[in-house]
């Protein structure tokens, strides 16, 4: 059987919040017919979107084939230019005190690997809480900026500390270390 799902961590967060009765606005980059489909599905799922429309390329198509083993084919995504990133920054400048910004997922290859840090620095002192759900270095790099909440899974937590975490005590110990490094809350 075939199934098409619009996803990505940001889309999934907004969809979950809508299901729980909370308003949110999904931000990010879309392009081409797949970007139009993402916007359409966002509306159907009950949340607002305010995407930057990228001129070249199309939003990624990731194919997952399931049988005894899962095979993954991930598309490249659109060609995000510096002016597209500037447009995102302008949208983020509209956030107000008390707002919550979720930074989630991987960073497209043509964007600075430090964009989460850049965004958090830009928001510093404005009373905006940041939640970061990302892998290893993306997460470790933002800790000095004191994110309100980080959400590493067990595997990601083990990657950050260079070991497999087998007990609840080890997980708690690593979570506390992340708080010592700057995270306000670790989920």
Name each model-derived stretch:
Residues 54, 65-97:
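Conserved phosphate-binding/catalytic loop of the ribokinase/pfkB sugar-kinase fold
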Residues 95-100, 146:
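Short acidic/histidine-rich motifs immediately flanking catalytic phosphotransfer sites
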Residues 78-81, 107-111, 138-140, 159:
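Short, small-residue-enriched loops and turns at beta-alpha junctions
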Residues 117-187:
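Conserved phosphate/ATP/ADP-binding segment of small-molecule kinases
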Residues 110-118:
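Active-site core of PLP-dependent enzymes with the aminotransferase class I/II
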Residues 72-74, 98-105, 133, 151-156:
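Short beta-strands and strand-loop turn motifs
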Residues 2-58:
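Substrate-binding N-lobe of the ribokinase-like
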